[in-house]
C-alpha cells in the first residue's frame, strides 16, 4: 500500500502471518446496554516493511501492523461521549485489544479480546 502528499508519503508491503480475528460473538460486537452493536474484525498478524518519505529523507521501516474493520447500521447510544481503543502485541505472539465507550453517567461500557498466537480468541464483555 502507498500514499503520498506534499510532506509525507509511504510505500509499505503487508503480509498476513495469522488468521483474521472476529471480535465479540463471531464478529458481532456489542457497544451499549441499549443494544447498539457493530460487526468488527481485525487482522492483527501483519508483518510490515517499507519506506516512509519525509521532508528530511526516506526512512526504511519494518515491524508488526494491525488492521481493523468495523461497521454498524446505527450511531452510538445518545449517552456515549467518546471512544478509547488500544491494542498490545506481546513478545510471545499474543495480542490484547480493548475499548471503552465513555458515557455521561460515568458507567462506561467496555469490551476486550485476548488473542492467542494461533488466532484463537477469548472475548470479555462489559464488566
Cite the ranges covered by each PLM segment.
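Structured soluble/peripheral alpha/beta segments that form catalytic or ligand/cofactor-binding pockets
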Residues: 1-127
Amino acid at each position: 500500500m502507498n500514499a503520498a502528499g506534499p510532506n509525507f508519503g509511504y510505500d509499505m508491503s503487508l503480509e498476513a502471518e495469522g488468521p483474521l480475528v472476529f471480535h465479540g460473538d463471531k464478529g458481532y460486537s456489542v457497544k451499549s446496554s441499549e443494544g447498539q452493536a457493530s460487526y468488527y474484525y481485525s487482522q492483527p498478524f501483519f508483518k510490515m516493511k517499507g519506506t516512509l518519505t519525509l521532508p528530511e529523507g526516506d526512512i526504511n521501516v519494518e515491524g508488526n501492523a494491525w488492521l481493523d474493520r468495523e461497521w454498524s447500521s446505527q450511531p452510538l447510544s445518545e449517552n456515549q461521549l467518546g471512544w478509547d481503543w488500544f491494542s498490545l502485541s506481546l513478545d510471545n505472539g499474543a495480542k490484547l485489544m480493548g475499548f471503552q465507550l465513555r458515557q455521561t453517567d460515568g458507567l462506561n461500557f467496555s469490551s476486550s479480546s485476548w488473542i492467542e498466537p494461533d488466532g484463537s480468541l477469548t472475548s470479555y464483555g462489559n464488566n
